[in-house]
């Protein structure tokens, strides 16, 4: 354990979209001599990733309320009070100089407990539309960090920081000019794979003239990779289909164009890598936050926003033909994406935490 006054508590859980930016900040705190502890819940991905990172993980019992039955709703106040008390006990034991929350069910009770203990609370919102817990915690927070501008209402607390992403994803601007080789298309469906994209891309690419057709690397998810490869084979399109991508920096460095969903971290990584994209937001995401994320790049001309409901194979093929016939357009989009990146996001978030911790 670090010396007195050198503990920091990070709260993040549930999905990688919350946990990965938090891990980036955890490493930055450690570089500056702080001991990082983590507050999570028993069911989230943090139970795998946080111990792998060598960080102590403290658990509280809390879950979401959306879509739950009447009995769960009746129990909710008691469950939340219990979670707050559990978090307060952990905070009193650790005596952190600040508490930094990234979202997930753990953040609500943990944020309330931080306020009860008199520990400065900083929250970070990864999406362009703030989650419920973060919205409710704004009045209790010393600072509120947002990845995208104007996610929160204007106030003295608000800071636009960007999303912390791994430094290796910030790419050198130099790529082999497209005129000297075939274009390279990277398709990302997330760790589980996005089946609508898995069905859409083979059909769309079959409608792109063979002379114009790009090299294709398609990450389809473990369940869907075999059938996706078969779909490409059936329409006569060459593609490398994989369940996962272990080295995202290498994949981004290879690509000229990306087709993917619009999760907050993905959007930030595309900017970091300086990659143009065609974004198909998950249509049923909470508060439609993926559409708002995609608009950040699309408004500036770094991406095309393609709603799933109105994007079929013909529409996607038309858009692909448009940019593949105009490689200079892809170059302009890439430069715009790179200008929207926030390479200092991780250090900025940590600076803000230490500013409120130590005045």
Swiss-Prot record:
InterPro entries: GlcNAc_MurG (IPR006009), Glyco_trans_28_C (IPR007235), GlycoTrans_28_N (IPR004276). Pathway: Cell wall biogenesis; peptidoglycan biosynthesis. Cell wall formation. Catalyzes the transfer of a GlcNAc subunit on undecaprenyl-pyrophosphoryl-MurNAc-pentapeptide (lipid intermediate I) to form undecaprenyl-pyrophosphoryl-MurNAc-(pentapeptide)GlcNAc (lipid intermediate II). GO terms for molecular function: UDP-N-acetyl-D-glucosamine:N-acetylmuramoyl-L-alanyl-D-glutamyl-meso-2,6-diaminopimelyl-D-alanyl-D-alanine-diphosphoundecaprenol 4-beta-N-acetylglucosaminlytransferase activity; undecaprenyldiphospho-muramoylpentapeptide beta-N-acetylglucosaminyltransferase activity. It is a peripheral membrane protein. It comes from the Bacteria. It catalyses: di-trans,octa-cis-undecaprenyl diphospho-N-acetyl-alpha-D-muramoyl-L-alanyl-D-glutamyl-meso-2,6-diaminopimeloyl-D-alanyl-D-alanine + UDP-N-acetyl-alpha-D-glucosamine = di-trans,octa-cis-undecaprenyl diphospho-[N-acetyl-alpha-D-glucosaminyl-(1->4)]-N-acetyl-alpha-D-muramoyl-L-alanyl-D-glutamyl-meso-2,6-diaminopimeloyl-D-alanyl-D-alanine + UDP + H(+). Its EC number is 2.4.1.227. One of its GO terms (cellular component) is plasma membrane. One of its GO terms (biological process) is regulation of cell shape. NCBIfam families: murG. The gene is murG. This is UDP-N-acetylglucosamine--N-acetylmuramyl-(pentapeptide) pyrophosphoryl-undecaprenol N-acetylglucosamine transferase. Coiled coil: none annotated. Belongs to the glycosyltransferase 28 family. MurG subfamily. UDP-N-acetyl-alpha-D-glucosamine binds at residues 15-17, 127, 166, 191, 245, 264-269, 290. It holds the Pfam family Glyco_transf_28. Its main location: membrane. It is found in: Cell inner membrane. Keywords: Cell cycle, Cell division, Cell inner membrane, Cell membrane, Cell shape, Cell wall biogenesis/degradation, Glycosyltransferase, Membrane, Peptidoglycan synthesis, Transferase.
């Amino acid at each position: 354990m670090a010396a007195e006054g050198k503990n920091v508590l990070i709260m993040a859980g549930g999905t990688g979209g919350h946990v990965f930016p938090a891990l980036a900040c955890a490493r930055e705190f450690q570089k500056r001599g702080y001991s990082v502890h983590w507050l999570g819940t028993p069911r989230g991905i943090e139970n795998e990733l946080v111990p792998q990172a060598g960080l102590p993980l403290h658990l509280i019992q809390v879950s979401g309320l959306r879509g739950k039955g009447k009995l769960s709703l009746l129990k909710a106040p008691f469950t939340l009070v219990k979670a707050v008390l559990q978090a307060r006990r952990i905070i009193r034991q650790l005596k952190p100089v600040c508490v930094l929350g990234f979202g997930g069910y753990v953040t609500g009770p943990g944020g309330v407990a931080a306020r009860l203990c008199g520990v400065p609370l900083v929250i970070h919102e990864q999406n362009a539309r703030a989650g419920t817990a973060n919205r409710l915690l704004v009045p209790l927070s010393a600072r509120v960090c947002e990845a995208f501008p104007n996610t929160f209402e204007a106030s003295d607390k608000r800071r636009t920081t960007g999303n912390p992403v791994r430094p290796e994803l910030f790419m050198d601007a130099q790529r082999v000019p497209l005129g000297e080789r075939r274009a390279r298309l990277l398709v990302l469906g997330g760790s589980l794979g996005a089946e609508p994209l898995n069905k859409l891309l083979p059909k769309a690419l079959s409608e792109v003239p063979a002379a114009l057709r790009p090299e294709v690397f398609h990450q389809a998810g473990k369940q869907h990779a075999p059938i996706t490869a078969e779909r490409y084979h059936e329409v006569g399109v060459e593609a490398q289909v994989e369940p996962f991508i272990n080295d995202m920096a290498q994949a981004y460095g290879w690509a000229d164009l990306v087709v993917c969903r619009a999760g907050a971290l993905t959007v930030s990584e595309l900017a970091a890598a300086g990659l143009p994209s065609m974004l198909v937001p998950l249509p049923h995401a909470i508060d439609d936050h993926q559409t708002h994320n995609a608009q950040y790049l699309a408004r500036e001309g770094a991406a095309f926003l393609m709603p799933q409901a109105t994007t079929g194979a013909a529409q996607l093929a038309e858009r692909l033909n448009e940019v593949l016939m105009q490689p200079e357009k892809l170059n302009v989009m890439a430069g715009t994406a790179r200008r929207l990146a926030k390479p200092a996001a991780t250090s900025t978030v940590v600076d803000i935490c230490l500013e409120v911790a130590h005045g």
